[in-house]
Amino acid sequence: MGSPVQLSLLCVVLASLLLPGKGVFINRERANNVLARTRRANSFFEEFKKGNLERECMEEICSYEEVREIFEDDEKTKEYWTKYKDGDQCESSPCQNQGACRDGIGGYTCTCSEGFEGKNCELFVRKLCRLDNGDCDQFCREEQNSVVCSCASGYFLGNDGKSCISTAPFPCGKITTGRRKRSVALNTSDSELDLEDALLDEDFLSPTENPIELLNLNETQPERSSDDLVRIVGGRECKDGECPWQALLINEDNEGFCGGTILNEFYILTAAHCLHQARRFKVRVGDRNTEKEEGNEMVHEVDVVIKHNKFQRDTYDYDIAVLRLKTPITFRMNVAPACLPQKDWAESTLMTQKTGIVSGFGRTHEKGRQSNILKMLEVPYVDRNTCKLSTSFSITQNMFCAGYEAKLEDACQGDSGGPHVTRFKNTYYVTGIVSWGEGCARKGKYGIYTKVTTFLKWIDRSMKARVGPTAETPRTAGPPN
């Protein structure tokens, strides 16, 4: 309650306003002056007091700068200011399906939970392949606005229509453990192929003949320097069972000169240019140390050499070949195939991953000696335009680039023909063949790889062209009609 003195003064003021000749009402300005509220702190000491939200913005009208001085944090200032100026737009909880609401001046923004979209997260997003691979374990494709899952060779689709299951002890694309059971052969497709059709797209050679004499169709064309043959610089040793699809091509002196990828128990994928580097060669699998026997190594003779007949020795275009072995590989520790993917799925899903993995026994640096230890290296995919600008050589549609611009890690001489695989949900798929590069781990230069997705049909036809380990002596195919 006010004191008697204060009440008396108020009565005097009000009485003076009602002097004779004056109206009952007064203008707003005079009334506000009479009822004006005195500030709690005087103007001088106000500047020295720490900002107080109640004093500055509730008892008085505050400015944005005053709010910022109170919170001393830009984000908290903006959050409070938007509510202070026009109220909390999120108060009515406009975001549906557990969406998070963020208030704004004159509006709000919803951050939707996975599977929902729209201004208020009111729209359900169909789980197509672009969203978490449609929940498929392996291959995903879209049909009539729905997802269809499928599996790599050697797997079958589970009852849920999503998972891929294999009963084989060593299915493709899985790192191996200590299991030593024999696996079944993997089929790449259920469809049949006419042998003559297959022969139109590749060259067939017998390794008992001289590959140099049979393959020198482009002998007069200029070749890249041997220093440009890709080729692991950097990286680390492949742990036990970690690179089971690695194959090694060995010459008559039992020396490794190129790599390869195990596709199934009879077939090895490699680079076409490797076929020019030895008169006769065999394939060794299960090797992690060429100077030490570990019990999993096996050597296989080659029955048929299938080289793409469009291979260009001057550009390394179509640098791909398939080797058929005389005897089947027994899958075991450190010996298992990598999976062949589906083309569209591989290009939209696998090759949009950040990295792939290369492995081999190549040189440990550009002028160094061959490694006796199997090494692996994770390499990032490189944007196509970036790669093309990094070299004066042609980067065709049958190639892709991977590696580091400046980091001293790369594939190198001796790794040629070896695997480039990409991991997806703990399964490894063949995505490339080590092909060529300018030196090893040079700054601004990348490794160039044969793009396997371009040749998946060719690989499938090549593996179907012979049906048993005792195929008759192959012949060299003519050019495509």
Curated annotation (Swiss-Prot):
Domain EGF-like: start-end pairs: 86-122, 125-165
One record GO biological process: proteolysis
Coiled coil: none
Signal sequence region: 1-20
Modification note: The vitamin K-dependent, enzymatic carboxylation of some glutamate residues allows the modified protein to bind calcium. N- and O-glycosylated.
Catalytic function, reaction form: Selective cleavage of Arg-|-Thr and then Arg-|-Ile bonds in prothrombin to form thrombin
Key words, A-Z: Blood coagulation, Calcium, Cleavage on pair of basic residues, Disulfide bond, EGF-like domain, Gamma-carboxyglutamic acid, Glycoprotein, Hemostasis, Hydrolase, Hydroxylation, Protease, Repeat, Secreted, Serine protease, Signal, Zymogen
Sequence positions bearing (3R)-3-hydroxyaspartate: D103
Gene Ontology, cellular component aspect: extracellular region
Disulfide bonds listed in the record: C57-C62, C90-C101, C95-C110, C112-C121, C129-C140, C136-C149, C151-C164, C172-C339, C238-C243, C258-C274, C387-C401, C412-C440
Active-site residues from the entry: H273 (charge relay system), D319 (charge relay system), S416 (charge relay system)
Tissue: Plasma; synthesized in the liver.
Top enzyme class: hydrolase
EC number: 3.4.21.6
Xref: PROSITE patterns: ASX_HYDROXYL, EGF_1, EGF_2, EGF_3, EGF_CA, GLA_1, GLA_2, TRYPSIN_DOM
Boundaries of every Peptidase S1 domain copy: 232-464
Residue ranges annotated as propeptide in the record: 21-40, 184-231
InterPro entries: Coagulation_fac-like_Gla_dom (IPR017857), EGF-like_Ca-bd_dom (IPR001881), EGF-like_dom (IPR000742), EGF-type_Asp/Asn_hydroxyl_site (IPR000152), EGF_Ca-bd_CS (IPR018097), GLA-like_dom_SF (IPR035972), GLA_domain (IPR000294), Pept_S1A_FX (IPR012224)
Ranges of residues in domain Gla: 41-85
Regulation of its activity: Inhibited by SERPINA5.
Function: Factor Xa is a vitamin K-dependent glycoprotein that converts prothrombin to thrombin in the presence of factor Va, calcium and phospholipid during blood clotting. Factor Xa activates pro-inflammatory and pro-fibrotic signaling pathways in a protease-activated receptor (PAR)-dependent manner.
Family (UniProt): Belongs to the peptidase S1 family.
Quaternary context: The two chains are formed from a single-chain precursor by the excision of two Arg residues and are held together by 1 or more disulfide bonds. Forms a heterodimer with SERPINA5. Interacts (activated) with guianensin, an anticoagulant protein from Simulium guianense saliva. Interacts (activated) with simukunin, an anticoagulant protein from Simulium vittatum saliva.
Protein's name in the database: Coagulation factor X
